[in-house]
Amino acid sequence: MSAMFLLQFAIVLLCIFVGARVGGIGLGVFGGLGLAILSFGFGLKPAGLPIDVMFMIMAVVAAAAAMQAAGGLDYMIKIATKILRRNPKHITFIAPAVTWLFTLLAGTGHVAYSVLPVIAEVSRQNGIRPERPMSMAVIASQFAIVASPIAAAVVAVVAYLEPQGIHLGDVLMVTIPSTILGLFLACLFVNKMGKELKDDPEYQRRLNDPKYADIFASTTSVKEVEVSKTAKISVSLFLFGALLVVLMGAAPSIRPVFDGKPMGMAHTIEIIMLSIGALIILTCKPDGTAITKGSVFHAGMRAVIAIFGIAWLGDTLMQAHITEVKEMVKGLVETAPWAFAFALFVLSVLVNSQGATVATLFPLGIALGIPAPVLIGVFVAVNGYFFIPNYGPIIASLDFDTTGTTKIGKYILNHSFMLPGLLSMFFCLLIGLGLSHVIL
């Protein structure tokens, strides 16, 4: 390994670290700064931009943001709330099932924010330690991203692997069952995590603290949201678009044919989701300003800018040193290709973006000759958000759990989400790798 490669690699890592600390569009712009150093300073030729990935994400975000502005996300949250309140005794299993399903349908984990107070309230009122369902609900909302046909990370994987004959249906046949089974197995363990609520010393202290008297006396923590007919229509249209994406991904023969080949999946997703966004705007007439002010639009555009900068930076470095990198990791790729999961996990911890992680490392995995079944099997490893407790829903859950059972420990990493996250990761990876070798 040359000193020049190590120096340039250190620059890339520094840009990722600083960009992640800055937050917002930090990853993207610091990726651009790193690219300026590599190109102007070291003379590296910039790699090709991940245009297809960026455009697919923008198309999906446009449709999802229109749905949110039309009240569709509120409607989905209302349904989720009803499900949680009807099954209080099994909330450690029901809560993650709800956040997993609604993240899969919406392509974003933002639904978790709104159901967390419901989970906290229902579990406390039924004497269940809120830490258990809260932690698994947050983890499930992350892991469901790899199972959603309209999530940024999934459309990116499809774009990279389609030249190898891998279609959307192939990816989902692995990620959907592996995340369902993996999360369920993790729930079995987490259901016994920590002391029972009635025996928890912090909760008992708060019960006797006058400051918490009004909070614990309250029986409602979320107001009922009125849902309009147009909100329901927007959800129906959005889910119809998602279904079309799945069908055309699973059956390329139903796509238009040009020069003897079916239309590429990138263009298919872009056309379908932009059209769905247009239909939502025409039929539901949401406020045009609200579309671009919503949380879905902001998060989606941040992901696009992150991929623009960081993925471009990483690809530029790897293309310049691909021969050296291949030689360096050749033995590892041949003997333990699954070890690529560690790289995905570590980068996802740093960048807090599944889409950016895929766009940065999947081209490297393909260039190194890692088989597509292995790449799909370890895809779930892009969900390392939980390792450092700075992810939005993690912070939110600490505030919503008034019992104090959901917490960050003295040493930062000994937090409520570490064990649920590691268990979920282990089981999902194990099942995902097994399924990918059987199915693909």
Curated annotation (Swiss-Prot):
GO terms for molecular function: antiporter activity; C4-dicarboxylate transmembrane transporter activity. InterPro entries: Anaer_Dcu_memb_transpt. Keywords: Antiport, Cell inner membrane, Cell membrane, Membrane, Transmembrane, Transmembrane helix, Transport. It is found in: Cell inner membrane. Belongs to the DcuA/DcuB transporter (TC 2.A.13.1) family. Responsible for the transport of C4-dicarboxylates during anaerobic growth. Catalyzes the uptake of fumarate, malate, aspartate or D-tartrate coupled to the export of succinate. May function primarily as a C4-dicarboxylate transporter during fumarate respiration. Required for anaerobic growth on D-tartrate. This is Anaerobic C4-dicarboxylate transporter DcuB. The lineage of its organism: Bacteria, Pseudomonadati, Pseudomonadota, Gammaproteobacteria, Pasteurellales.
